């Protein structure tokens, strides 16, 4: 319903982005080799975040923390390091959570991704120029934000609903970063893998 109380049908073209990785970054220095200033940077940042999740282990949480800090453009506090640890250790999630967002991974195959590693993401379904959540929309008028914040989505077998993060483009560097702490929105519990994990 528009602002005149009339019902409208809005056609929206949803773009998808698939990233295929021949090499997988395992630390922040390797992560920095990827260009996140390009037009698709907001999606690439999300793809790199998912790859960062794969590096967390109980014996080496540091690489994952540093990778997320880089993509978030700020150092991770101890509170969020503890949050990350708790989410990764719950149900041994660190063994499959990062893989769950990759193409080919399903609960039935214990979240084993297809090779080569690839991730498919999609843009927001909200209409409007650029899909910024701070722009005027016929049926939704959010608070204006600076910088403009954009949502990037993933649909995957681990959940019956989409997951997303918010990103923004840095005004000086042109790099796309994760907005605030939305990086942890992908850490919500997912469907359990079929077997071979101890709980």
Where are the model-predicted features located?
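Flexible glycine-rich surface loops and low-complexity tracts that mediate binding to linear polymers
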Residues: 1
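Intrinsic-disorder/low-complexity loop/linker signature
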Residues: 4-7, 16, 145, 174
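Core segments of small alpha/beta cavity-forming domains
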Residues: 6-106
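Short beta-strand edge/turn micro-motifs at domain boundaries
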Residues: 7, 155-198
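Contiguous hydrophobic segments
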Residues: 57, 73-74, 113-131, 181-199
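Surface-exposed, charged secondary-structure patches
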Residues: 80-158
